[in-house]
Amino acid sequence: MRLSRGLYPRFVTLEFDMKTIQTLPRVLSMAAVALASVLLAGPAHAQSCGGDINDDGLVNSGDLATLLSNWGACAVSAPTISQVAPNSGPASGGTVIYIGGTNLNRATSVTVGGVAATVLAAYPTVIVATTPPSATGGAKTVAVTTPGGTASANNAFTYGAATPSWATLLEAAPDPVVVTSASLRAAIAASGFAWRVRDTATQIEMVLVPAGTYTMGCTASNTFGCAAAENPTRQVTITNAFYMGRYEVTQAQWTARMGSNPSNFQSASAQVPLAQVPSRPVETVSWTTVQGFRTATGMRLPTEAEWEYASRAGTTTAFNNGSSDDNTAVNIAWYNANALSQTRPVGGKAANGLGLHDMSGNVWEWVSDWYGAYPAGAQTNPTGPATGTNRVLRSGSWGYSANFMRSSYRGFNTPAFSGIDIGFRVARNP
């Protein structure tokens, strides 16, 4: 609708939408009151001219025209972020941060890693806020939202490595002497979780296995080829980081939870003094019996794919020490060439590239999967066949040759079977 009136010194022509028309009487009334107050106050030259919008020395229809022509929401400039300080803090949150930039004073939301922060103060060029807790550590995006839009600063704030609620921190960052691969250290850091922790309830030490992709299956040694069950090889992706016991579960750890010790090797020997017997791996435990320990502790068995991924620790060779030479198995495993027909205290051989010990030899280790032929093609987080007769065993033991120490070797037995060279290690989600 077009409205023209000649009641003022200047002719005013304006365009209105329906909403403006509905509010026009109130606006005109307010304007009339304002103009009347100006007139009653005396000559134009004596007033402050606070209403002189167009700066012509008069408060009149021209000013009203300017007001009405700009009726509606005011434009708001988009925010920007130039810096965040400090740029790091604990995963527990509570760090006071200063977000510098422009057009920040009308902030409606501030987030760190997608989680709302607590805003303490907001000014045009700086926001003061406290960081929220983070379920994971690592670099996070800081974002500020105003009526003018959202500004984001990628990786602007880094949380320290998070320790799971069930654990006690031992080492946040991987020891480069143990985790020698820079890519593995980077993957552990990127996960946002601490590298080495201790389960508070059981005192079982665990290390983080980061997410990743590897080739699962046959890797022959210089002496031994692969069994048919180790083929076909295929790409396997583990999408989530998980913790794995640094050592096989010991007799002491089992007894503390289950109340009795089923192991065959409960006595001292010429090689194992009495004080070290509790640190021998528990054995003579069936897959079925292990479920009781799992339930009592909140732990789980690793899947077969997780186990091999953790054992390899980035290697593509027969053995997890980066070699395919059978003579090097003696450095990482207790097997028939050096064990003297008995288990040995856990951790006595060199760790692999993640800090895991005895992933070859000492005792066979139950995993969660039913045993079956490998499917062809790439897989993500495989869990094995849905049903079966036997459960998978990995790692070889003190009674077997170097062939069985290879990372890809697969064993199996019925869930009810327990042998004097069969134990396990645990896994747990963060």
Question: Where do the model's predicted regions map?
Answer:
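Sec/Tat signal peptide C-region and signal peptidase I cleavage site
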Residues: 42-46
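Bacterial N-terminal signal peptides
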Residues: 29-39
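Alpha-helical segments with a strong preference for the paired helices of cellulosomal dockerin domains
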Residues: 53-75, 103-105, 252-255, 259, ...
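Surface-exposed, short loops/turns at beta-strand junctions within beta-sandwich domains
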Residues: 133-138
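Conserved structural position at the C-terminal beta-strand
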Residues: 144-146
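Beta-strand/beta-sandwich contexts
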Residues: 76-106, 149-162
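Surface-exposed recognition segments
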Residues: 222, 226-236, 315, 323-325, ...
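Active-site microenvironments of metalloenzymes and redox enzymes
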Residues: 166-176, 213-325, 369-373
